[in-house]
């Protein structure tokens, strides 16, 4: 087992260096989790899927990255003015953001002004042959642009449309511009870190993982019904679900426990 993980680590490092030397996203990376027990590359289960990624930042980019790593054709639809905001993130190498390339490897990119009727028609043509759409606009924005689920499912009834937001599509709180730190605070996640700022983005990652699971479930369902679905993924709900084991303490005991108390001695090494 140790030799297997050593090969995995070496392979990941080599792949990342090849990506950097060859212009990063122009090269195809083999993710470590796509290796079988013998260290050989697995077949790509999503190579017949087309994904349109309308999202910005980690929240939507991570689910489409997962699909891309396993063979899906992911077309990232970016704004004509600034593109994905990830492109501006620091630190950068030669004017290129590491954050952008870490999240958007193995993806194609197109710049669309979806407010232009002619461009919108071109986008609709992509929808006809697409399988999955991912977006993280604030509720109502997609409808104003004419790219909401109702509109696009009329073009392609098999489309799986994943909407990511802070509290869900029907909660008015999602109309505000909220970020990971807001959700982490409101769900009580900072109790785990005793108020220290999380090094990663727990709410973003939690919602991204729920989105991946929801998309995979919808693909299985579509195989049985030949119909798509609208997936409503909320960051708040996802992080609460992620913390289910810890949050349940309140319901069972009516109190919290000191952060130093290990409730599960058998996993005390974590």
What are the functions of these language-model segments?
Residues 43, 170, 176, 180, ...:
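Acidic, glycine-rich segments within the central catalytic cores of soluble metabolic enzymes
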Residues 46-48:
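Phosphate-coordination loops involved in phosphoryl transfer and adenosine-cofactor binding
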Residues 52, 98-154:
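A structured beta-alpha segment of the ubiquitous adenosine-cofactor-binding alpha/beta core
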Residues 60-61:
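N-terminal Rossmann-fold NAD(P) dinucleotide-binding loop
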Residues 69-106:
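Glycine-rich phosphate-binding loop and adjoining beta1-alpha1-beta2 segment
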Residues 116, 135-191, 205:
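N-terminal Rossmann-like NAD(P) cofactor-binding subdomain of oxidoreductases
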């Amino acid at each position: 087992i140790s030799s297997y993980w050593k090969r995995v680590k070496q392979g990941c490092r080599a792949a990342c260096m090849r990506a950097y030397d060859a212009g990063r996203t122009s090269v195809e990376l083999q993710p470590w989790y796509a290796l079988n027990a013998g260290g050989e590359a697995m077949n790509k289960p999503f190579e017949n899927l087309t994904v349109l990624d309308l999202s910005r930042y980690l929240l939507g980019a991570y689910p489409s990255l997962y699909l891309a790593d396993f063979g899906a054709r992911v077309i990232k639809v970016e704004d004509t003015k600034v593109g994905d905001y990830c492109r501006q993130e620091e630190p950068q190498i030669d004017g290129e953001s590491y954050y952008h390339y870490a999240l958007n490897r193995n993806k194609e990119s197109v710049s669309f002004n979806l407010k232009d009727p002619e461009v919108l028609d071109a986008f609709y043509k992509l929808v006809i042959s697409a399988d999955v759409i991912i977006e993280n606009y604030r509720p109502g924005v997609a409808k104003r642009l004419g790219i909401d689920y109702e509109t696009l499912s009329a073009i392609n009834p098999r489309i799986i449309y994943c909407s990511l937001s802070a509290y869900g599509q029907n909660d008015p709180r999602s109309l505000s511009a909220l970020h990971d730190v807001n959700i982490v605070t409101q769900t009580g996640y900072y109790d785990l870190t005793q108020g220290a700022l999380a090094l990663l983005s727990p709410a973003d990652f939690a919602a991204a993982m729920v989105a991946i699971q929801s998309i995979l479930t919808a693909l299985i369902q579509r195989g049985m019904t030949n119909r798509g679905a609208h997936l409503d993924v909320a960051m708040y709900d996802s992080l609460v679900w992620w913390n289910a084991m810890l949050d349940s303490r309140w319901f069972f005991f009516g109190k919290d426990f000191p952060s130093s108390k290990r409730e599960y001695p058998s996993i005390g090494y974590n």
